[in-house]
């Protein structure tokens, strides 16, 4: 860590006012002149055409309730769901576990033996696996005595887990593709999720983790926090949840991994998103960890505890906590990307407990003039350093909007969007009268990008006023159910562009029905979502392209949209000197110009809600005109 002094210079942009005319003083007229009555009938003004406006994107999307969904879709009967009787365990007993094979996207069953029993934990070992039993016992006892209390103090002072058992279970076995995991599915009855173990389980892969090591305890602490967070705020954004889990390792006094270094080697990594390919997530872990560590060090334990317990998600939870400081999530993010470069010990721009390397430069500017056309992810940063012999004139311009997913609706300007998030249940519903037809066909256009085999969209019909629903089969929907998340014929994965879907409604001809589109996501990772346009039922003359509004469809989580959100920018410079000077702009008009000296670092960051689409910008480095 470097010990420097920082001077923050606020910058006010003076933007030109266009098309503004200052009126001359009004002439005073003492009496109004007589206006004769016209001898003709004036032509009435035409009725104005109302142009619809997109709905605002909600802060929170509806949270899924798998029990309610199972009843509504006829998977289980209404009424109380039996829960297993809490069991008393003893060393040497055996039990069968459902375990996920992540690379193969499937569950398998295996038998394990109870090896270690403490006040709060039952540690099981998969049958036939060699393991150092003494090292396992020492690790579990150390976790119980030292690590468990530290994590509970920060993340859940009152144990929130409604245990169907007498302990928290730790499965130690061979688990392909991961070091460990926690699954919220185990909190449900097997009637609701077919692969539930019906008890709280932390899964550790002893193929890559050795009991008795810091690494084993770190992964155990990491997954234990995920368990706690599921019960405290189960629909929290994945990037926040993962940051909390890494902070659990750090707060417990365990060494943190090299993910921070991986992130700083790729600082153009979106903080607020998570890839659905686990092999690409290592820099994301680093971003989440450094951001949470920065927040914890700057605002303290109490603020961090309030953040953990906030019912809001993602940036909104930070805004809630930071409001008392007069700050926003964007303010904190802007300070953080400066801290990642300066790492100053004595100011808000650095870390006290960590010593991360500098972020990788996007480019070093060694000659001028030069113009760069670049992209940067939302809530990420590109770093440039001026290494010329003379001052330069910087000119920046960037796009003012960004898309949520597809480049445009299938037709016109408007469409519906499912929203996105973890543990989401969004619906879009409309009544239809099919009484006067003996045949009916639903047609619609869709563009979707959903976490394959984990997140699904369904098309449903109800003929009893919405009490019960049936999932309909489409051309591209699938009944494959490798992970247990597919409730019927679901759309999942990627459509590869706008596609036409067709569903037979003839079994409901002659009836009044409700049609519904429903997005249901699991508890981690989400993609752009499901977009919907141009719905038709030709047999009853129904066609809706949504260019005049909602068209009678009632959303609960779905958003009426043009697919575009405002693109924000934060441009910052660090000017070398003693002390260094930090300048910051949030431009709303382009181009932005600034004269910069050799040695100056420029940081370009983009911010837009919800989307994971990158932002485009231009940076021109030019000679300073003479006289400036």
Q: What label would you give each PLM region?
A:
Residues 21, 25, 29-31, 36-49, ...:
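Beta/coil-rich, acidic/histidine-enriched accessory regions frequently appended to metallopeptidases
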Residues 129-130, 415-427, 450, 489-497:
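Extracellular beta-rich ligand/substrate-recognition surface
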Residues 460-512, 545, 560-568, 574-587:
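Exoplasmic/lumenal beta-rich domain surfaces
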Residues 117-244, 248, 252-274:
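Juxtacatalytic substrate-recognition/specificity segment
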Residues 266-345:
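Active-site-proximal alpha-helical
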Residues 440-446, 513-520, 546, 604:
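Extracellular beta-strand-rich recognition modules
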Residues 297, 433, 445-451, 518-520:
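Solvent-exposed strand-to-loop "edge" motifs in beta-rich extracellular domains
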């Amino acid at each position: 860590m470097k010990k420097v002094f920082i001077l923050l210079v606020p910058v006010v942009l003076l933007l030109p006012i266009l098309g503004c005319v200052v009126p001359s003083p009004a002439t005073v007229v003492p009496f109004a002149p007589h206006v004769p009555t016209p001898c003709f009938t004036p032509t009435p003004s035409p009725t104005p055409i109302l142009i619809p406006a997109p709905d605002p994107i909600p802060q929170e999307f509806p949270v899924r309730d798998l029990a309610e969904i199972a009843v509504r879709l006829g998977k289980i009967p209404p009424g109380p769901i039996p829960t297993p009787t809490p069991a008393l365990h003893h060393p040497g007993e055996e039990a069968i576990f459902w375990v996920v094979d992540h690379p193969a996207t499937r569950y398998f069953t295996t038998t394990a033996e109870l090896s270690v029993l403490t006040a709060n934990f039952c540690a099981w070992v998969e049958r036939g696996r060699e393991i150092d039993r003494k090292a396992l016992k020492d690790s579990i006892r150390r976790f119980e005595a030292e690590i468990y209390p530290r994590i509970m103090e920060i993340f859940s002072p009152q144990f929130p887990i409604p245990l169907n058992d007498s302990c928290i279970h730790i499965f130690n076995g061979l688990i392909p593709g991961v070091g460990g995991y926690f699954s919220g599915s185990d909190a449900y009855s097997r009637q609701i999720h077919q692969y539930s173990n019906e008890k709280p389980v932390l899964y550790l892969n002893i193929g890559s983790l050795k009991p008795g090591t810091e690494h084993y305890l770190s992964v155990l602490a990491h997954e234990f926090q995920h368990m706690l967070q599921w019960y405290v705020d189960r629909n929290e954004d994945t990037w926040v949840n993962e940051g909390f889990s890494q902070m659990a390792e750090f707060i417990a006094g365990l060494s943190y991994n090299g993910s921070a270094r991986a992130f700083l080697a790729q600082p153009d990594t979106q903080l607020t998103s998570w890839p659905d390919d686990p092999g690409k997530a290592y820099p994301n872990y680093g971003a989440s960890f450094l951001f949470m560590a920065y927040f914890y060090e700057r605002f303290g334990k109490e603020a961090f505890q309030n953040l953990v317990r906030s019912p809001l998600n993602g940036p909104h939870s930070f805004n809630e906590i930071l409001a008392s400081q007069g700050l926003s999530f964007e303010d904190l993010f802007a300070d953080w990307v400066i801290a990642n470069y300066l790492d100053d010990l004595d100011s808000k721009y650095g870390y006290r407990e960590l010593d991360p390397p500098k972020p990788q430069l996007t480019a070093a500017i060694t000659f001028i003039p030069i113009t760069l056309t670049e992209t940067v992810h939302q809530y990420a940063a590109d770093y440039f350093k001026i290494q010329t012999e003379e001052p330069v004139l910087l000119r920046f311009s960037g796009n003012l909007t960004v898309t949520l997913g597809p480049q445009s609706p299938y037709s016109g300007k408007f469409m519906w969007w499912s929203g996105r998030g973890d543990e989401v249940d969004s619906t879009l519903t409309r009544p239809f009268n099919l009484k006067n037809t003996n045949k009916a066909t639903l047609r619609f256009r869709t563009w979707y990008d959903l976490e394959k085999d984990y997140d699904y969209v369904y098309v449903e019909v109800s003929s009893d006023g919405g009490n019960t629903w049936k999932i309909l089969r489409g051309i591209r929907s699938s009944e494959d159910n490798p992970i247990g998340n597919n409730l019927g014929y679901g759309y999942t994965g990627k459509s590869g562009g706008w596609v036409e879907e067709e569903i037979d409604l003839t079994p409901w001809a002659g009836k009044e029905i409700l049609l519904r589109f429903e997005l249901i996501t699991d508890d981690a990772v989400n993609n752009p979502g499901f977009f919907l346009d141009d719905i038709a039922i030709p047999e009853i003359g129904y066609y809706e392209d949504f260019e005049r509004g909602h068209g009678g469809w009632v959303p609960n989580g779905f958003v009426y949209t043009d697919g575009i959100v405002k693109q924000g920018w934060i441009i910052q410079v660090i000017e070398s000197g003693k002390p260094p000077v930090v300048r910051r702009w949030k431009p709303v008009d382009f181009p932005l110009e600034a004269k910069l000296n050799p040695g100056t670092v420029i940081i370009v960051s983009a911010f837009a809600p919800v989307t994971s689409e990158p932002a485009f910008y231009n940076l021109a480095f030019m000679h300073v005109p003479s006289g400036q």
